[in-house]
Protein backbone atom coordinates (compact mmCIF):
# COMPACT_ATOMS: atom_id res chain seq x y z
CA UNK A 1 0.00 0.00 0.00
CA UNK A 2 1.26 3.46 -0.89
CA UNK A 3 0.87 5.54 2.28
CA UNK A 4 0.41 8.97 0.72
CA UNK A 5 -1.82 11.10 2.89
CA UNK A 6 -2.92 14.73 2.84
CA UNK A 7 -2.45 16.27 6.27
CA UNK A 8 -5.35 18.24 7.71
CA UNK A 9 -4.97 21.69 9.32
CA UNK A 10 -1.22 21.46 8.71
CA UNK A 11 -0.28 25.12 9.08
CA UNK A 12 -2.64 25.59 12.00
CA UNK A 13 -1.02 22.67 13.85
CA UNK A 14 2.50 23.95 13.29
CA UNK A 15 1.49 27.42 14.50
CA UNK A 16 -0.24 25.89 17.53
CA UNK A 17 2.85 23.96 18.60
CA UNK A 18 5.03 27.11 18.61
CA UNK A 19 8.01 24.90 17.74
CA UNK A 20 11.38 25.58 19.34
CA UNK A 21 14.30 24.64 17.05
CA UNK A 22 15.94 22.68 19.89
CA UNK A 23 12.73 21.24 21.34
CA UNK A 24 11.51 17.67 21.67
CA UNK A 25 8.15 16.89 20.05
CA UNK A 26 5.95 13.83 19.75
CA UNK A 27 3.53 13.00 16.94
CA UNK A 28 1.31 10.36 18.52
CA UNK A 29 -0.51 9.46 15.30
CA UNK A 30 2.26 9.50 12.71
CA UNK A 31 0.21 8.24 9.77
CA UNK A 32 1.53 9.65 6.50
CA UNK A 33 4.02 11.84 8.44
CA UNK A 34 2.83 15.09 6.86
CA UNK A 35 2.65 16.90 10.18
CA UNK A 36 5.90 15.28 11.34
CA UNK A 37 7.75 16.34 8.22
CA UNK A 38 6.78 19.95 8.81
CA UNK A 39 7.80 19.72 12.47
CA UNK A 40 11.20 18.36 11.42
CA UNK A 41 11.69 21.25 9.02
CA UNK A 42 11.34 23.60 11.99
CA UNK A 43 13.90 21.76 14.12
CA UNK A 44 17.67 22.28 14.17
CA UNK A 45 19.08 20.37 17.14
CA UNK A 46 15.63 19.26 18.26
CA UNK A 47 14.06 15.81 18.14
CA UNK A 48 10.85 14.25 16.89
CA UNK A 49 9.30 11.07 18.27
CA UNK A 50 6.83 9.50 15.83
CA UNK A 51 4.35 6.96 17.18
CA UNK A 52 1.91 4.76 15.28
CA UNK A 53 0.22 1.43 15.93
CA UNK A 54 0.24 0.66 12.20
CA UNK A 55 3.53 -0.86 10.98
CA UNK A 56 2.70 0.01 7.38
CA UNK A 57 2.41 3.68 8.36
CA UNK A 58 5.72 3.53 10.24
CA UNK A 59 7.56 2.07 7.25
CA UNK A 60 6.12 4.73 4.95
CA UNK A 61 6.98 7.48 7.44
CA UNK A 62 10.55 6.23 7.70
CA UNK A 63 10.96 6.73 3.96
CA UNK A 64 9.28 10.13 3.96
CA UNK A 65 11.39 11.42 6.86
CA UNK A 66 14.71 9.97 5.67
CA UNK A 67 16.32 13.41 5.21
CA UNK A 68 15.67 14.07 8.90
CA UNK A 69 16.61 10.59 10.16
CA UNK A 70 19.05 11.92 12.78
CA UNK A 71 16.26 13.93 14.40
CA UNK A 72 13.63 11.19 14.33
CA UNK A 73 12.80 8.25 16.59
CA UNK A 74 9.98 5.98 15.38
CA UNK A 75 7.99 3.86 17.83
CA UNK A 76 5.46 1.09 17.11
CA UNK A 77 2.88 1.59 19.85
CA UNK A 78 -0.50 3.08 20.69
CA UNK A 79 -0.45 6.77 21.62
CA UNK A 80 -2.41 5.96 24.78
CA UNK A 81 0.92 4.65 26.13
CA UNK A 82 2.67 7.99 25.67
CA UNK A 83 3.94 8.04 29.25
CA UNK A 84 5.57 4.61 28.95
CA UNK A 85 6.96 5.51 25.52
CA UNK A 86 8.71 8.61 26.86
CA UNK A 87 10.00 6.76 29.92
CA UNK A 88 11.48 4.04 27.68
CA UNK A 89 13.32 6.78 25.76
CA UNK A 90 14.69 8.27 28.97
CA UNK A 91 12.40 11.29 28.79
CA UNK A 92 9.95 12.79 31.26
CA UNK A 93 8.52 16.06 29.95
CA UNK A 94 8.80 17.39 26.41
CA UNK A 95 7.98 20.58 24.49
CA UNK A 96 4.95 19.58 22.49
CA UNK A 97 2.67 16.80 21.28
CA UNK A 98 0.34 16.41 18.33
CA UNK A 99 -2.47 13.90 17.87
CA UNK A 100 -4.46 13.60 14.62
CA UNK A 101 -7.21 11.18 15.63
CA UNK A 102 -8.68 10.49 12.20
CA UNK A 103 -8.22 7.25 10.29
CA UNK A 104 -5.74 8.02 7.53
CA UNK A 105 -6.87 7.96 3.91
CA UNK A 106 -4.50 5.11 2.93
CA UNK A 107 -6.02 2.90 5.63
CA UNK A 108 -9.50 3.68 4.33
CA UNK A 109 -8.48 3.23 0.71
CA UNK A 110 -6.68 -0.10 1.18
CA UNK A 111 -9.51 -2.59 0.60
CA UNK A 112 -7.71 -5.37 2.47
CA UNK A 113 -7.90 -3.44 5.74
CA UNK A 114 -11.70 -3.63 5.82
CA UNK A 115 -12.31 -0.03 6.95
CA UNK A 116 -14.30 1.02 3.90
CA UNK A 117 -17.96 0.35 3.18
CA UNK A 118 -17.29 1.13 -0.51
CA UNK A 119 -15.10 -1.89 -1.34
CA UNK A 120 -15.39 -5.60 -0.62
CA UNK A 121 -12.86 -6.93 1.89
CA UNK A 122 -12.56 -9.25 4.86
CA UNK A 123 -14.07 -7.80 8.05
CA UNK A 124 -10.87 -6.64 9.74
CA UNK A 125 -10.62 -2.90 10.66
CA UNK A 126 -7.51 -3.32 12.83
CA UNK A 127 -5.15 -0.35 12.88
CA UNK A 128 -2.57 -2.62 14.51
CA UNK A 129 -2.51 -5.82 12.46
CA UNK A 130 -0.81 -7.62 15.35
CA UNK A 131 -3.81 -7.34 17.69
CA UNK A 132 -6.27 -10.23 17.79
CA UNK A 133 -9.69 -8.52 17.91
CA UNK A 134 -11.18 -7.90 14.45
CA UNK A 135 -14.46 -6.62 13.05
CA UNK A 136 -15.28 -10.23 12.12
CA UNK A 137 -15.15 -11.23 15.79
CA UNK A 138 -17.43 -8.37 16.84
CA UNK A 139 -19.96 -8.82 14.05
CA UNK A 140 -20.19 -12.60 14.34
CA UNK A 141 -19.67 -13.30 18.03
CA UNK A 142 -20.59 -10.34 20.22
CA UNK A 143 -24.05 -10.51 21.85
CA UNK A 144 -26.86 -8.69 20.08
CA UNK A 145 -27.32 -6.22 22.96
CA UNK A 146 -23.63 -5.36 22.92
CA UNK A 147 -23.74 -4.82 19.17
CA UNK A 148 -26.74 -2.54 19.58
CA UNK A 149 -24.91 -0.62 22.29
CA UNK A 150 -21.75 0.06 20.27
CA UNK A 151 -23.74 1.01 17.16
CA UNK A 152 -25.72 3.53 19.18
CA UNK A 153 -22.94 4.87 21.42
CA UNK A 154 -19.99 4.86 19.02
CA UNK A 155 -21.83 5.42 15.74
CA UNK A 156 -24.80 7.43 17.01
CA UNK A 157 -26.81 5.14 14.72
CA UNK A 158 -30.54 5.70 15.21
CA UNK A 159 -31.40 2.30 13.70
CA UNK A 160 -29.01 0.41 15.99
CA UNK A 161 -31.64 -2.05 17.35
CA UNK A 162 -32.83 -2.99 13.87
CA UNK A 163 -29.29 -3.39 12.50
CA UNK A 164 -28.16 -5.51 15.46
CA UNK A 165 -31.23 -7.73 15.02
CA UNK A 166 -30.56 -8.13 11.29
CA UNK A 167 -26.92 -9.08 11.95
CA UNK A 168 -28.04 -11.69 14.49
CA UNK A 169 -30.56 -13.21 12.06
CA UNK A 170 -27.98 -13.62 9.30
CA UNK A 171 -25.11 -14.90 11.45
CA UNK A 172 -27.38 -17.60 12.89
CA UNK A 173 -27.37 -19.22 9.43
CA UNK A 174 -23.87 -18.34 8.22
CA UNK A 175 -20.85 -16.23 9.21
CA UNK A 176 -20.71 -12.65 7.92
CA UNK A 177 -17.28 -12.47 6.32
CA UNK A 178 -16.93 -9.35 4.18
CA UNK A 179 -17.59 -5.63 4.32
CA UNK A 180 -20.12 -5.61 1.50
CA UNK A 181 -22.03 -8.49 3.09
CA UNK A 182 -22.31 -6.32 6.19
CA UNK A 183 -23.35 -3.29 4.11
CA UNK A 184 -26.20 -5.32 2.55
CA UNK A 185 -27.38 -6.42 6.01
CA UNK A 186 -27.30 -2.83 7.29
CA UNK A 187 -29.29 -1.65 4.26
CA UNK A 188 -31.87 -4.39 4.79
CA UNK A 189 -32.50 -3.19 8.35
CA UNK A 190 -33.12 0.45 7.46
CA UNK A 191 -36.31 2.09 6.16
CA UNK A 192 -36.44 3.32 2.58
CA UNK A 193 -36.36 6.95 3.74
CA UNK A 194 -32.98 6.42 5.43
CA UNK A 195 -31.56 4.82 2.29
CA UNK A 196 -32.41 7.95 0.32
CA UNK A 197 -30.37 10.22 2.58
CA UNK A 198 -27.13 11.75 1.33
CA UNK A 199 -24.98 9.94 3.90
CA UNK A 200 -24.07 6.33 3.10
CA UNK A 201 -26.32 4.05 5.18
CA UNK A 202 -23.36 2.06 6.53
CA UNK A 203 -21.22 5.03 7.57
CA UNK A 204 -22.27 5.20 11.22
CA UNK A 205 -22.19 1.43 11.75
CA UNK A 206 -18.72 1.09 10.24
CA UNK A 207 -17.46 3.96 12.40
CA UNK A 208 -18.88 2.26 15.49
CA UNK A 209 -17.34 -1.13 14.76
CA UNK A 210 -13.97 0.44 13.91
CA UNK A 211 -13.97 2.37 17.20
CA UNK A 212 -14.78 -0.83 19.11
CA UNK A 213 -12.10 -2.88 17.35
CA UNK A 214 -9.40 -0.33 18.13
CA UNK A 215 -10.72 0.94 21.49
CA UNK A 216 -10.34 4.42 20.04
CA UNK A 217 -12.28 6.37 22.65
CA UNK A 218 -10.52 4.74 25.59
CA UNK A 219 -7.20 5.51 23.94
CA UNK A 220 -8.17 9.16 23.45
CA UNK A 221 -8.94 9.81 27.12
CA UNK A 222 -5.93 7.91 28.43
CA UNK A 223 -3.60 9.41 25.83
CA UNK A 224 -4.70 13.01 26.39
CA UNK A 225 -4.41 12.78 30.17
CA UNK A 226 -0.94 11.25 29.91
CA UNK A 227 0.15 13.83 27.33
CA UNK A 228 -0.77 16.71 29.64
CA UNK A 229 1.24 15.14 32.46
CA UNK A 230 4.33 14.83 30.26
CA UNK A 231 4.51 18.38 28.90
CA UNK A 232 7.06 20.90 30.10
CA UNK A 233 5.69 24.22 31.40
CA UNK A 234 4.86 26.18 28.27
CA UNK A 235 4.65 22.98 26.22
CA UNK A 236 1.79 22.73 23.74
CA UNK A 237 -0.72 19.95 23.07
CA UNK A 238 -2.58 20.03 19.74
CA UNK A 239 -5.37 17.53 19.03
CA UNK A 240 -7.37 17.07 15.82
CA UNK A 241 -10.68 15.19 16.03
CA UNK A 242 -13.07 14.16 13.29
CA UNK A 243 -16.30 13.27 15.06
CA UNK A 244 -18.27 14.52 18.03
CA UNK A 245 -17.47 11.57 20.32
CA UNK A 246 -13.71 12.18 20.21
CA UNK A 247 -14.10 15.94 20.33
CA UNK A 248 -16.28 15.71 23.43
CA UNK A 249 -13.65 13.62 25.22
CA UNK A 250 -10.82 16.00 24.31
CA UNK A 251 -12.90 19.02 25.33
CA UNK A 252 -13.77 17.43 28.68
CA UNK A 253 -10.17 16.36 29.40
CA UNK A 254 -8.96 19.89 28.62
CA UNK A 255 -11.63 21.52 30.78
CA UNK A 256 -10.91 19.19 33.69
CA UNK A 257 -7.15 19.78 33.46
CA UNK A 258 -7.68 23.56 33.31
CA UNK A 259 -9.64 23.63 36.58
CA UNK A 260 -8.10 24.96 39.74
CA UNK A 261 -9.50 24.63 43.23
CA UNK A 262 -12.55 22.37 43.51
CA UNK A 263 -13.37 23.17 47.15
CA UNK A 264 -16.97 24.23 47.90
CA UNK A 265 -17.48 28.02 47.74
CA UNK A 266 -18.26 28.03 51.46
CA UNK A 267 -14.69 27.00 52.35
CA UNK A 268 -12.70 30.05 53.56
CA UNK A 269 -9.41 28.62 52.22
CA UNK A 270 -8.49 25.96 49.68
CA UNK A 271 -7.86 22.55 51.19
CA UNK A 272 -7.82 20.49 47.99
CA UNK A 273 -4.55 21.98 46.78
CA UNK A 274 -5.57 21.51 43.18
CA UNK A 275 -4.05 23.85 40.60
CA UNK A 276 -4.66 24.10 36.86
CA UNK A 277 -2.39 21.93 34.73
CA UNK A 278 -3.09 23.66 31.44
CA UNK A 279 -4.37 26.83 29.85
CA UNK A 280 -6.81 26.25 26.99
CA UNK A 281 -5.76 28.29 23.96
CA UNK A 282 -8.80 27.56 21.78
CA UNK A 283 -12.11 28.74 23.25
CA UNK A 284 -13.67 27.29 20.14
CA UNK A 285 -11.97 24.62 18.02
CA UNK A 286 -10.08 25.70 14.92
CA UNK A 287 -11.66 24.39 11.72
CA UNK A 288 -10.47 24.15 8.13
CA UNK A 289 -10.75 27.10 5.78
CA UNK A 290 -13.12 26.96 2.84
CA UNK A 291 -10.10 26.61 0.56
CA UNK A 292 -8.78 23.58 2.45
CA UNK A 293 -12.18 21.91 2.46
CA UNK A 294 -12.44 22.36 -1.31
CA UNK A 295 -8.97 20.88 -1.76
CA UNK A 296 -9.39 18.12 0.83
CA UNK A 297 -13.05 17.31 1.65
CA UNK A 298 -11.91 15.09 4.54
CA UNK A 299 -10.95 18.26 6.43
CA UNK A 300 -14.60 19.40 6.61
CA UNK A 301 -15.23 17.65 9.94
CA UNK A 302 -11.80 18.31 11.48
CA UNK A 303 -11.56 20.28 14.74
CA UNK A 304 -8.30 21.37 16.34
CA UNK A 305 -8.06 22.06 20.07
CA UNK A 306 -4.89 23.42 21.66
CA UNK A 307 -3.71 23.69 25.26
CA UNK A 308 -0.54 24.92 26.96
CA UNK A 309 0.98 23.41 30.09
CA UNK A 310 1.30 25.84 33.02
Residue ranges and their predicted role:
Residues 1-310:
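S-adenosyl-L-methionine-dependent methyltransferase catalytic core, i.e., the SAM/SAH-binding region
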Amino acid sequence: MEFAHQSVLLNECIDALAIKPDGIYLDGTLGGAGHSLQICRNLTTGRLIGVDRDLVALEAAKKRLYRHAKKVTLVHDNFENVGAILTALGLDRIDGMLFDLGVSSPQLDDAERGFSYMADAPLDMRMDREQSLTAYEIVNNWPREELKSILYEYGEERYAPQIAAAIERVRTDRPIETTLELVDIIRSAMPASALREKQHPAKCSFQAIRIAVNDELGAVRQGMEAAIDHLKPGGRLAVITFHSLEDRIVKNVFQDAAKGCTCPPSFPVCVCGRKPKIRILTKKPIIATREEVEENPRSRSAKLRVAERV
